[in-house]
UniProtKB/Swiss-Prot annotation:
PANTHER family named among the record's database cross-references: MITOCHONDRIAL 28S RIBOSOMAL PROTEIN S6, SMALL RIBOSOMAL SUBUNIT PROTEIN BS6M
Protein name as annotated: Small ribosomal subunit protein bS6
Biological role: Binds together with bS18 to 16S ribosomal RNA.
The organism of origin for this protein: Rickettsia rickettsii (strain Sheila Smith)
Molecular functions (GO terms): small ribosomal subunit rRNA binding; structural constituent of ribosome
Any GO CC annotation of this UniProt entry: ribonucleoprotein complex
Pfam name, any one: Ribosomal_S6
InterPro entries tied to this protein: Ribosomal_bS6, Ribosomal_bS6_sf, Ribosomal_S6_plastid/chlpt, Transl_elong_EF1B/ribsomal_bS6
UniProt family annotation: Belongs to the bacterial ribosomal protein bS6 family.
GO biological process terms on file: translation
Protein keywords: Ribonucleoprotein, Ribosomal protein, RNA-binding, rRNA-binding
Length: 121
């Protein structure tokens, strides 16, 4: 098993309940393949650097994972097939910090409330 960090951007018009369903689908894939979600953070609805399709904003979500390479490939395949996900990036990491990410630390509570920050060790 290896550590991975994955960030994905969900279309601006998707509801928070639907975002939870998307993340739950990814969590099911991970758990079914003996992986672990170490950390998950909702970074809020943020303005994109440039327009992607008809989207000027997007919901940003971060996952810290302990999974195998095969699970990473399956997650990325599901992200590509999900029409609500407009961009994603998954990288291998040396470890997953138990601290909140710098983006979450700098985030104003007025701009985007934190839905869920979970750290499992």
């Amino acid at each position: 098993m290896s550590f991975y960090e994955s960030v994905f951007i969900i279309r601006q018009d998707v509801s928070l309940n639907d975002i939870d369903k998307i993340v739950d689908d990814f969590a099911k894939i991970i758990k079914d393949n003996n992986g672990t979600i170490i950390k998950k953070e909702y970074w809020g609805l943020r303005t994109l650097a440039y327009k992607i399709g008809n989207n000027k904003k997007g919901h940003y979500y971060f996952l810290g994972l302990d999974i195998t390479g095969n699970v990473k490939e399956e997650l990325e395949r599901k992200m590509k097939l999900n029409e609500n996900i407009i961009r994603f990036l998954t990288i291998q990491a040396d470890s997953i910090s138990s601290e909140p990410s710098p983006i979450l630390k700098n985030q104003s509570t007025e701009n985007a409330p934190v839905i869920d920050v979970t750290i499992n060790n």
